[in-house]
Each structure stands twice: as C-alpha cells, then as structure tokens.
UniProtKB/Swiss-Prot annotation:
This is Dof zinc finger protein DOF2.5. One of its GO terms (molecular function) is DNA binding. Expressed in the vascular system of the mother plant, but not present in the seed and embryo. In maturing siliques, found all through the funiculus connecting the placenta to the ovule, but not in the ovule. Zn(2+) binds at residues 82, 85, 107, 110. Pfam families: Zn_ribbon_Dof (PF02701). GO terms for biological process: cellular response to red light; cellular response to water stimulus; positive regulation of gibberellin biosynthetic process; positive regulation of seed germination; red light signaling pathway; response to cold; response to light stimulus; seed germination. The keyword Transcription regulation applies.
Length: 369
C-alpha cells in the first residue's frame, strides 16, 4: 500500500466515515464485490422517512440518545408539592419504588410517603424529632407538679393530746378518734404511763365517776368530760347516762369490778381476777365427798375462792342465775331439815343427806345431821 493511500485512508477515518466505506478499498478488483455488498438497505425511521445505509446508522445512534433523554424526562425532575402539607421539600424515591406506573414520593416536611395515583400514608416514617420529645417530657413534668396540689392530703399529721387541748371547744365536735392520749400524763403520778391505763373508779350503780383531769376536749358521749378509752368502755360495760342513748350491760358492772382490786400487767391490760365469784359453797372439783365436818366445808369454800374462778363476761345474768340457784338450794335444804326433825346432832343419818346439807349450806360451815 502506498503512503499516499495510507494518508488518505487515515484522513477518512478521522472524518468518521461509516464502516462500509472504510472497509471498501479503491482498487478495481473489489468493485464487483462492493456492488453486490453495497445494497441500499432502506430502513424506516421514526419519522417515516426511508434512508440509505449511510444515513441509517447515524439516525439509529441519534434515536438511542433521544430514547435515553426521553427516559430521563419521564422521571420528574421538578419537585412536586406534598398533598398533605403542600411543601416543595419532596423527593422521588429511586430505590424503594415498587412500580413504575405509580412512582413513589417522599415529603421531608411531614415525613410521609405518597404514590402518584395512590393514597397518602398517614403514619410518619421513623419517630418524632428530639425537640418534640423534650417538649413532651417537660409538659408531663408540669402535669405531675400540678396534680398533687389539687389532690387532698391523704396522710394528715397526727395530733396528740397536748395539741388537742389547745383547740377550742367549738372545733372539738368530731368523733374524737384521737382521744387515746399518748403523752398527756405530766400532771399525774406516772409520767410515762398512758392515760388509758389509769382507770376511773366505779360506783355500785355502774355509772362512771371520772377522775379530776384538766381536759377541755369533749368525748363522744355527752356525760363524760375526759377522753374515753376502749379499755374503760369494756370495763364499765358502756353504762353511761341515759341521755347519751347507750345503756348496754354486756360486761360486768362496777360492783363486780373495782379499780382498787384490778391488777394491771406491764402492757396495761387488767389480769383476769375474780370478775364473778360464785355464791355456791361447794367447789366444782367434787373433792371431799362424804365429809361433813365444818373444817372440811370451810376448806372447800376457801379452795373455791382460790381456784374456781368463773370468768363469764355476762355479769348481771350470771348474778341472777346464781342467786336463783342458791334460793332453790336453801328451800330444799329447809324442807330436808323439817322432814328429819331438825336433828343437828344425828351423825348416823344417810350419807346423801349429810352430803347435800354440807354442800348447800349458805353459811359455808354447814350443819351435820
């Protein structure tokens, strides 16, 4: 190949000619082949114009470029307004788009997705911002601060007896639930002993005679001027005056329990001493059967008062029952004495009569007949 032909071919290549023209040499030997190979292939373009092979390749390249541009133009380059907040701070979702027919968009203002031709997602993506969290926590703390001021105090301070005395009489119309004084006995003999351990003395009729105490607090019951303790009510059987409306005798009356004879333990509660001594002259242990001597009956009588304690709380009913029993026993004893001729020196009588006369004698000594 000559140098001139080489330079011409290089210039033609620089002018970017079609491959068919570059591959075809200018000699006569290849002309018949070129005529057969260089058929004018007519191709219809998008515009409907038929072109030859030389122009078809250029048009096809241009069509490819226009197709890429058309695809890029199909994607929205401009920012759309959010259908919820109408803001332009939106973006097209390239990666999490599920279908090209309904492209997906995202609003950065309200943090919501929406699709073109679809519905708006109402739930925001992610959480709220940190600024909103701080504001919500501060509002909740303000609510907690305002709630205790509106609610009543469920734990009022405990008022002792020295604070109750300072109150006026008009303000002491409550139920007097704090009438158990704790540190009120500075004026009494025992400084550290509570007042409810010092019981008032009882009279025979069962009414309460209160101690002389400097107290201005009125009790629940109208007749008492000092605080009434629970132990005091149990002892007296709630036998207060009739105007108070309480006349119950479920506990022993004052004649059966005297404050001078009641023994108190260290805890302040009375020991169960003889609340109701029995009027019968025989013991319930059935000791000493058949012995009718006066010494034996006196020993049984003393033994009964030391050991046989009747601890029934129903004082008045037991008193009436015991008195009726002794009257019946005395009546039977008198009939037996009359039937036997009132023979007090007869020691050879039947053991049954001697037993009953010795046991049911009211004097305690008994008579042997």
């Amino acid at each position: 190949m000559d140098a001139t032909k080489w330079t011409q071919g290089f210039q033609e290549m620089m002018n970017v000619k079609p491959m068919e023209q570059i591959m075809i040499p200018n000699n006569n030997t290849h002309q018949p082949n070129t005529t057969s190979n260089a058929r004018p292939n007519t191709i219809l373009t998008s515009n409907g114009v038929s072109t030859a092979g030389a122009t078809v390749s250029g048009v096809s390249n241009n069509n490819n470029n226009t197709a890429v541009v058309a695809e890029r133009k199909a994607r929205p380059q401009e920012k759309l307004n959010c259908p919820r907040c109408n803001s332009t701070n939106t973006k097209f979702c390239y990666y999490n788009n599920y279908s090209l027919t309904q492209p997906r968009y995202f609003c950065k203002g309200c943090r919501r997705y929406w699709t073109e031709g679809g519905s708006l997602r109402n739930v925001p993506v992610g959480g709220s911002s940190r600024k909103n969290k701080r504001s919500s926590s501060s509002s909740s703390s303000n609510i907690l601060q305002t709630i205790p001021s509106s609610l009543p105090d469920l734990n009022p301070p405990i008022l002792f007896s020295n604070q109750i005395h300072n109150k006026s009489k008009g303000s002491s119309q409550d139920l007097n639930l704090l009438s158990f004084p704790v540190m009120q006995d500075q004026h009494h003999h025992h400084v550290h002993m509570s007042q409810f351990l010092q019981m008032p003395k009882m009279e025979g009729n069962g009414n309460i005679t209160h101690q002389q105490q400097p107290s201005s607090s009125s009790s629940v019951y109208g007749s008492s001027s000092s605080p009434v303790s629970a132990l005091e009510l149990l002892r007296t059987g709630v036998n207060v005056s009739s105007r108070s409306g309480i006349n119950s005798s479920f506990m022993p009356s004052g004649s059966m329990m005297d404050s001078n004879t009641v023994l108190y333990t260290s805890s302040g509660f009375p020991t169960m001493v003889d609340y109701k001594p029995s009027n019968l002259s025989f013991s319930t242990d059935h000791q000493g059967l058949g012995h009718n001597s006066n010494n034996r009956s006196e020993a049984l009588h003393s033994d009964h008062h030391q050991q046989g304690r009747v601890l029934f709380p129903f004082g008045d009913q037991m008193k009436e029952l015991s008195s009726s029993i002794t009257q019946e026993v005395d009546h039977d004893d008198n009939q037996q004495q009359k039937s036997h001729g009132n023979n007090n020196n007869n020691n050879n009588s039947s053991p049954n009569n001697g037993y009953w006369s010795g046991m049911f004698s009211t004097t305690g000594g008994g008579s042997s007949w």
